[in-house]
Amino acid sequence: MAITVTAKQVKELRDRTAAGMMDCKKALVEAEGDLELAIENMRKSGAVKAAKKAGRVAAEGVILAKVEGSVALLAEVNCETDFVAMDKSFLAFANKIAEIALANKVASVEALNELAYDGDTVEVARANLVSKIGENISIRRLHIVEGENLGAYVHSGKIGVISVLKGGDADLSKDIAMHVAAAAPQYVKAEDVPADVVAKEKEIQLAIAVESGKPEAIAEKMVAGRMAKFSGEVSLTSQPFIKDPSIKVAKLLKDAGAEVISFIRLEVGEGIDKKVEDFAAEVAATMAASAK
């Protein structure tokens, strides 16, 4: 006997799962109208869909930065396309897991996945969202930091920074975070640059100078100048302050009686090999296949 599924049942299932209308109707028919069984089955199928999509490259997404008192969080949540990175459901999930991680001071993705999320776990919520949206979604990395004066800045959801200062005020820590986002220093001070990094850069600069045909003595002087510039470029305190290039960050901090202890800077997709789609070739291949 065929099971009749009402519009009210479909709506209730949609409200509870956020899945598509046809998926809800199909699940209710298969569960013979049992709402709870339909939800259970959809979660199972959602997990299967999520597993199938797990191997796909997720290099787009959003960076989130949150500060609560003396604790701050910086996180990256990835998806496959920039379109989904702007999706309300994706952003709601990303913001909620950031709040959960901050509240529990969790900096491990594995530990976060086990925490509660609307009656389920974060991992189940992620799998359900993969099923709904149709893209691989991953919580890539989390950082929890504690400090006296924490600053947070996110630029267009793509670059995020947490700055940790001793002294100064909230405006200063935010300005430092904003500067780090824009100037991308790698170290706090010039003396923090590791010796092997300096040696490698010197080797590169010397090779460039020699290749240009300069005499060795002149090449050495050129390299010395370039190395001084290199240390200034990669260290925060040696950089011109982004909001007032007439002063260095070091002077800004000194005048405020403050010190930068550390900073963390994340950029969406950094270090991930993105697949470059050749849509023209894809269309040509599809047309060639259909012509056979």
Swiss-Prot record:
It comes from the Bacteria. Keywords: Cytoplasm, Elongation factor, Protein biosynthesis. Residues 81-84 are annotated as: Involved in Mg(2+) ion dislocation from EF-Tu. Signal peptide: none annotated. It is found in: Cytoplasm. The keyword Cytoplasm applies. SUPFAM superfamilies: Elongation factor Ts (EF-Ts), dimerisation domain, UBA-like. GO terms for molecular function: translation elongation factor activity. GO terms for cellular component: cytoplasm. Gene3D superfamilies: 1.10.286.20, DNA helicase RuvA subunit, C-terminal domain, Elongation factor Ts, dimerisation domain. Belongs to the EF-Ts family. Associates with the EF-Tu.GDP complex and induces the exchange of GDP to GTP. It remains bound to the aminoacyl-tRNA.EF-Tu.GTP complex up to the GTP hydrolysis stage on the ribosome. This is Elongation factor Ts. It comes from Psychromonas ingrahamii (strain DSM 17664 / CCUG 51855 / 37). The lineage of its organism: Bacteria, Pseudomonadati, Pseudomonadota, Gammaproteobacteria, Alteromonadales.
